[in-house]
């Protein structure tokens, strides 16, 4: 039985709640001592993990819609992607304001360049910013064939973001490895597409170098 447009609308409402409830919990935890001994790190890791969850959920939609034969499920992909960007922005903001502090924001650029795991994180965020900004149908029409080329960069985020997480933790624990494993699995489901993209990219680079 295929999902109807009405059911997808309610699914979108549920996904909005899924994006909002973690924020409400975080606010409650901050105000009621629900965080650990290092609340700043806890906030950073919580916002980062939530962004990763929405990234993985976004990547899950296409294969799920295909294998479950639920084409309308694709309509939820943009929503999940925007929540991923929102939580990634909270993650970056928590680092800038809580880790560095308002008085030290001038150091942000230096930190992002000199710390490799932060470099991976900011590259991922910039890509997500571009994808969020161009996610509307109007931008899709305006960009034409270039729209899909741009949005293929989500696969690069799926590689960089888990590495950023793994690199940022002091002690390797199962959790970042699980996120990395899920990202690899979701990318593996797109093996043929990724191989085609890589071949096309390699050909373009070769042609430019040959000029």
UniProtKB/Swiss-Prot annotation:
Cell compartments where the protein resides: Cell inner membrane
Pfam family name, one: Ferric_reduct
Transmembrane domains' residue ranges: 17-37, 82-102, 116-136, 153-173
Cited InterPro entries: Fe3_Rdtase_TM_dom, MsrQ-like
UniProt keyword Mitochondrion present: no
Keywords from the named record: Cell inner membrane, Cell membrane, Electron transport, Flavoprotein, FMN, Heme, Iron, Membrane, Metal-binding, Transmembrane, Transmembrane helix, Transport
GO molecular function terms listed in the Swiss-Prot or TrEMBL record: electron transfer activity; FMN binding; heme binding; metal ion binding; oxidoreductase activity, acting on diphenols and related substances as donors
Domain of life, source organism: Bacteria
Cofactor mode of binding and number, as noted: Binds 1 FMN per subunit. Binds 1 heme b (iron(II)-protoporphyrin IX) group per subunit.
Tagged with keyword Flavoprotein: yes
GO annotation, cellular component aspect: plasma membrane
Membrane topology: Multi-pass membrane protein
Required cofactor names: FMN; heme b
GO biological process, one term: protein repair
Role description: Part of the MsrPQ system that repairs oxidized periplasmic proteins containing methionine sulfoxide residues (Met-O), using respiratory chain electrons. Thus protects these proteins from oxidative-stress damage caused by reactive species of oxygen and chlorine generated by the host defense mechanisms. MsrPQ is essential for the maintenance of envelope integrity under bleach stress, rescuing a wide series of structurally unrelated periplasmic proteins from methionine oxidation, including the primary periplasmic chaperone SurA and the lipoprotein Pal.
Subunit composition and interactions: Heterodimer of a catalytic subunit (MsrP) and a heme-binding subunit (MsrQ).
Classification via NCBIfam families: PRK05419.1-1, PRK05419.1-2, PRK05419.1-4
Family the UniProt entry places it in: Belongs to the MsrQ family.
PANTHER family recorded: PROTEIN-METHIONINE-SULFOXIDE REDUCTASE HEME-BINDING SUBUNIT MSRQ (PTHR36964:SF1)
Name this polypeptide is given: Protein-methionine-sulfoxide reductase heme-binding subunit MsrQ
Organism from which the protein derives: Shigella sonnei (strain Ss046)
Gene name in the database record: msrQ
């Amino acid at each position: 039985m295929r999902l109807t447009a009405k059911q997808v609308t309610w699914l979108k409402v549920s996904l909005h709640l899924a994006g909002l409830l973690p924020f409400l919990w975080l606010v409650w935890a901050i105000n009621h001592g629900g965080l650990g001994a290092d609340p700043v790190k806890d906030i950073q890791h919580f916002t980062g993990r939530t962004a990763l969850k929405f990234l993985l959920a976004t990547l899950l939609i296409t294969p799920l819609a295909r294998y479950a034969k639920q084409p309308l499920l694709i309509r939820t992909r943009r929503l999940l992607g925007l929540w991923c960007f929102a939580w990634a922005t909270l993650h970056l903001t928590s680092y800038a304001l809580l880790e560095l502090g308002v008085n030290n924001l001038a150091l942000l650029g230096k930190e992002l360049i000199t710390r490799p795991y932060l470099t991976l994180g900011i590259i991922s965020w910039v890509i997500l910013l571009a994808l969020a900004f161009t996610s509307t149908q109007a931008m899709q029409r305006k960009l034409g064939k270039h729209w899909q080329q741009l949005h293929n960069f989500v696969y690069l985020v799926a590689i960089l973001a888990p590495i950023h997480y793994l690199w940022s933790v002091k002690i390797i624990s199962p959790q970042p490895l699980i996120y990395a494993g899920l990202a690899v699995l979701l990318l593996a489901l797109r093996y043929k597409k990724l191989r085609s993209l890589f071949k096309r990219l390699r050909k373009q680079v070769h042609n430019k170098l040959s000029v």
